[in-house]
Regions:
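Structural and coupling elements of P-loop NTPases
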Residues: 1-381
């Protein structure tokens, strides 16, 4: 895998109730990005992120898995977490390393306890977030009802970016609310432009008004234009969304069917376009020459520092320490100081983990997530 600069990295944790579709979404992302050449299924026990024997047996996640996908010029480090409350510590570890979150909601079940716990975790770690509603291919799913449930809980922060198109109850496409255009699926994730049907106009206008209000609030000039009845361009709306999503004042809602690859490329585009890179997140490091704490802030030009957010044990290869680089550029064979143990540790090889598969890399830039094998004294945290 190539090495990516900080501004090209997005660290995203997938959160949500157990069974909402996080692993299926991760699988679809991996497939569409070209990381895998087949689309696995949870029911078949052959997904990238659920590879443990117990996970395959249970048909659900029990630990956090890192799945890095390349989308355009960006690398998205996807952290697929378990939704079962017994494994909440896994979700907390992943949230501590992420810079943003996608809360996955079952379109069939709607907002559940796990949805609200995911939101609370985002609040705890101050994570910008989006919501992705799954199972849109099922006939009895109401996107509108899910949006209403979310709005009732979280108010005007909820802003749908897409809404479904249905014909005879079947999910056939979507409306892009930012661009105000319809899209019809012609084959899996491939689509073509189509007219917006009359029955969609009422809610399209309602959802679009929410977006326009958010855009207007980003500047006095936009507010004047909004009250003057002027339209905003797509570029202006997108720029305002990136600002508002980044500071958490707006939470976009997207939707699709990961098992059919529908809506997933839209989500990947939105992650790259609206979520911040790691440099916007504050963090600290220690300068070994002066013993002073400094603002690392995921700056590649500052001294090397990293934190271990999770430790995993492989029965064949031994222990892996999953790290997030806080500053500088960490390379194979570097010597880093362990603050807790007050000792130096020489790194061996650096890896990125594609599920259960370690891929060796020469270096990791500030903000990136990877793994180090067989560290002696290092511990999680």
């Amino acid at each position: 895998m190539d090495v990516f600069r900080t501004d090209r990295i997005r660290n995203v944790v997938l959160l949500g109730h157990s069974g909402s579709g996080k692993t299926s979404l991760t699988e679809a992302m991996a497939y569409l990005s070209g990381m895998t050449n087949r689309l696995g299924k949870v029911t078949d026990g052959n997904t990238v992120s659920d590879f443990d024997k117990e996970e395959i047996k249970r048909k659900c996640s029990i630990s956090t898995t890192l799945v890095p996908v390349v989308w355009g010029k960006n690398k998205i480090n996807v952290l697929d977490t378990p939704g079962m409350f017994d494994f909440v510590g896994e979700a907390q570890e992943a949230a501590s390393a992420a810079d943003a979150a996608v809360i996955v909601v079952s379109g069939k079940a709607g907002v559940q306890v796990g949805t609200q716990k995911a939101w609370e975790l985002c609040e705890k770690y101050n994570l910008p977030r989006m919501i992705f509603v799954t199972e849109m291919d099922q006939d009895d799913v109401s996107y509108r009802e899910v949006v209403e449930q979310l709005t009732e809980l979280y108010g005007k922060r909820i802003a749908p970016l897409h809404m479904p198109l249905r014909e005879n109850g079947k999910f056939v496409g979507y409306i892009n609310i930012v661009k105000n255009k319809g899209r019809r699926y012609i084959e899996k994730d491939k689509k073509e432009e189509c007219p917006i049907p009359d029955y969609s106009v009422e809610y399209l206008e309602k959802y679009r008004e929410t977006l326009m209000e958010s855009v207007a609030e980003t500047s006095e000039e936009f507010m004047d234009r909004y009250f003057g009845g002027e339209e905003f361009s797509v570029a202006e709306i997108s720029a305002a969304l990136a600002m508002n999503v980044g500071d958490g004042t707006i939470v976009p809602v997207c939707m699709g069917s990961p098992v059919n690859l529908q809506g997933v490329s839209n989500l990947l585009d939105d992650i790259c376009g609206y979520f911040p890179d790691p440099s916007t997140r504050p963090c600290a490091g220690i300068n070994l020459n002066t013993n002073e704490i400094f603002e690392a802030n995921y700056d590649f030009a500052k001294p090397k520092s990293a934190t271990i957010f999770k430790t995993i044990v492989d029965p064949f290869l031994g222990k892996y320490s999953m790290i997030k680089v806080c500053s500088g550029v960490i390379k194979s064979d570097d010597v880093l100081y362990n603050v807790d143990q007050e000792s130096e540790e020489k790194l061996s090889k650096l890896y990125v983990l594609e599920g259960s598969k370690p891929i060796e890399v020469p270096e990791l830039h500030a903000g990136d997530i990877g793994a180090i094998a067989k560290l002696g004294d290092a511990r999680t945290g």
